[in-house]
Design a protein with these regions (language model features):
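Phosphate/pyrophosphate-binding loops at sites that engage ATP/ADP/AMP, CoA/4′-phosphopantetheine
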Residues: 1-7, 141-157, 223-224
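Short secondary-structure capping/junction motifs at helix and strand boundaries
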Residues: 3-5, 56-64, 109-111
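Short coil-to-beta-strand
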Residues: 8-17, 109-115
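Long, hydrophobic, well-ordered secondary-structure blocks that form the structural core
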Residues: 43, 63-74, 79-80
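Condensing-enzyme catalytic core mediating Claisen C-C bond formation in acyl metabolism
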Residues: 79-144, 148-151, 184-195, 201, ...
């Protein structure tokens, strides 16, 4: 498989004008669609690429995303060189990248469903605590996805949020509890899985476009291939803020996009 086999690339990142995405794609010589949903870009890119394949607009589509700690800190908070004291609720942007090739040929892992999220704003203003701001969006998309796919929480082996981190994931669990839903071991957050918050100096956990993408490729896909998981739901979360809005004391609108992966036993045995 080579770049010449690709019909379209769908990708995004955290930098202004999708700088990293466009610099990467310029060497591929493949039609490219840039997408942005902050840290929910991973699910948006994969979902969009899946739709292009499903609708017959592409035989093979590449979905990719990336993030890097230093430029993200410079753009959304403060340059690392400033040595600004961070709050305990701050997350650590993951330096990483991931890509997935989607096609019509049956594979052991399939994208079963994709749900676009709505923008949710609970009037949170603290840019150093974006996990709390994003939790309501994750809950909203979870409900939408379950309704859209006629599924229940019991149908999934894993339900993973993108990067709510310790504070935001705890808030989501509280919101679920208020609805009578117990967030058991099937629930987790990619920002808590990619780092060990008890041993690494990452404050509240991981974040960034690469957070959910790297966990999906490295851990979720491994579990699906091994047969330890059958259906996994990824709720990638994004805080749609800019420093200009923060300077103006505006609130932080958030969004979550859902991607559901399923193990295909027929493809695994063939």
């Amino acid at each position: 498989f080579s770049c010449s086999d690709l019909d379209v690339c769908v990708g995004g990142d955290l930098m202004n004008q999708l700088l990293t995405t466009h610099y990467f794609a310029r060497d591929l010589h493949v039609p490219t669609l840039g997408v942005y949903a902050a840290c929910a870009t991973s699910s948006l890119a994969i979902g969009t690429a899946s739709l292009l394949v499903q609708q017959g607009m592409a035989a093979h589509a590449l979905a990719f995303t990336s993030s890097h700690n230093a430029p993200a800190e410079r753009q959304f908070r403060f340059p690392n060189e400033y040595a600004v004291q961070k709050k305990d609720t701050t997350t650590t942007t993951v330096s990483g990248a991931g890509s997935i090739v989607l096609g019509r040929t049956p594979q052991p892992i399939a994208v079963r469903a994709f749900t676009l999220g709505r923008i949710v704003d609970w009037h949170h203003q603290n840019a150093s605590d974006m996990g709390i701001a994003m939790a309501p969006a994750a809950l909203d998309t979870l409900h939408a996805h379950l309704a859209q796919t006629n599924s229940t929480i019991d149908d999934y082996d894993w339900i993973l949020t993108g990067d709510l981190s310790k504070a935001g994931f705890g808030f989501l669990c509280d919101l679920l509890s208020q609805e009578g839903i117990h967030a058991d071991s099937r629930f987790n957050d990619c920002g808590l899985m990619i780092y060990d918050v008890s041993r690494q100096p990452v404050f509240c956990g991981g974040s960034g476009c690469a957070c959910s993408m790297c966990v999906s490729i490295a851990e979720v896909f491994s579990q699906l291939r091994a047969g330890r998981k059958k259906r996994v739901l990824i709720l990638a979360t994004g805080a749609l803020l800019s420093m200009m809005a923060i300077y103006q004391k505006d609130t932080i609108p958030c969004i979550a996009h859902a991607i559901e992966y399923q193990r295909r036993d027929d493809a695994c045995s063939s």
